[in-house]
Amino acid sequence: MLIDIMFEKIGISLFELVTSIIFISWIVKKFILDKNVIIQSYMKVESKISLGYNEKIIIVDIKDVRLVLGVTSKRIVHLYTLPPIVYKKSQDSLIKSSNVGYKRNNYIRTMWNKTMVYQIASLCVFLLFCPSYAYAGIPDVISHTSSDGGQIWSIPIQTLVFITSLTFIPTVLLMMTSFSRIVIVFSLLRSALGTPYSPPNQILVGLSLILTFFIMAPIFDKIYQDSYLPFSEDKISIDTAIVRGAKPLHKFMVNQTRQVDLEFFSKLANISTFSRKEEIPMRVLLPSFITSELKTAFQIGFTIFIPFLIIDLVVSSVLMSLGMMMVPPSTISLPFKLMLFVLVDGWQLLITSLTHSFYH
């Protein structure tokens, strides 16, 4: 019985697939092939005579009219119109182009060639050997009330919610971690050095991601231990897992957010002052955290610009005193900037300062 049902589903699926292919082919034939046939039947070059370099006389049949045209490299001139003479061959061609049977045969020859047949046959054979669970239906939504009063959803629904939440990972990574501060500081460093394309964006983003995971490792580990592991062992519900997982991120963001920004967005949201930091809602904390991160990144960038700005001023003054006003100062100052950055071990100094700025 199960085998009969399985083959019935496979047969129905194959029928739908073949029907779809035939329908799409008919659409292609209807809007493309017929137009080509009609255009070819309306116009035909009967004969042509070459008179010289890029000079020809051409006789063209357009439906029942025969035209004599003079053609050069620059223009086409209508010379004469011959009497309307329709040859039997031309009549047969027009009759064929308007005949339904001819169109059908031409369509079959065009679309159902050997390559098309082989492709459809291979696809049908592949679908015949698909496992039966490929045709399984969508499971029902099942939920029940837990002992603590919460609602527990079935595993397929939980999986669907989890896969859907993966689309928000880039937003979480950009707005709720240390990534924004790091990547802005690296971009400002590149501008201060005077090398707008080196290191390239891919390297800066990759280095920022690595440092983000390094800095956020304790928070991610706590989320894994307190939220994911109990949920994977069915000890807590998905609602409890989300609440537990948000607490470490909430604490991290609160510690990096300025009090002024929190008060500003709380005022915009018409919320009074909070007695405890844990009571701050995410809709207030998230914009406050982003604003604080931007301000901190610009402050770090300002301190990075100062030594390189001094080098630019010194080089410009020297060039002006030597009368070399046509020489770009950035060309001369770039080697000195790179030498200074390498001598002070700039990468290690900058990465150390960025890491310590999150755990001061």
Swiss-Prot record:
GO BP, sorted A to Z: bacterial-type flagellum organization; protein secretion
Subcellular location(s) of the protein: Cell membrane; Bacterial flagellum basal body
Keywords recorded for this protein, A-Z: Bacterial flagellum, Bacterial flagellum biogenesis, Bacterial flagellum protein export, Cell membrane, Membrane, Protein transport, Transmembrane, Transmembrane helix, Transport
Domain of life: Bacteria
Disulfide bond entries: none
InterPro entries attached to this UniProt entry: Flagellar_biosynth_FliO, FliP, T3SS_IM_P
TM segment ranges: 10-28, 115-137, 152-174, 203-220, 297-319, 332-351
Keyword Protease: no
Membrane topology, as annotated: Multi-pass membrane protein
GO cellular component annotations of the record: bacterial-type flagellum basal body; plasma membrane
UniProt function note: Plays a role in the flagellum-specific transport system.
Similarity-based family: Belongs to the FliP/MopC/SpaP family.
Name of the protein in its database record: Flagellar biosynthetic protein FliP
Biological source species: Buchnera aphidicola subsp. Baizongia pistaciae (strain Bp)
Gene label: fliP
